[in-house]
């Protein structure tokens, strides 16, 4: 029986679900967390692939890779300052959580992703901002970059 290889994006989603901020919102609202598909619900999450050359450096033994992933969230939207502050605060706290996890080297588990991938870091490359808004909700996005080593 062959071993099932898990996509890197699935490992990143599993890691993000360990963030207390996301876990609390999912528990409180029942928010879905999809891969490449943000629903129109008032609160929902999605992680998506971003195009680009993933190879940073080529070595004799393998490659240093980097993949960019937009993290999207559907959130309540209003002209009321309290709602805007809450949305901004969510992404600020998420950015800080990612930075702390990187500093502690608590990175996504890529062991089930095949190819001997070893994570080396994760960073937020664009902070959270509104992409679109309509009818009481908005789509916000934050960009992350996962770096890892993959042997040949």
Each predicted region: which residue ranges?
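A short, hydrophobic beta-strand-centered structural micro-motif
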Residues: 43-50
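Short beta-edge strand/loop motif at the mouth of beta-sheet-based domains
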Residues: 38-42
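Charged, amphipathic alpha-helical segments and their flanking helix caps
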Residues: 1-35, 51-152
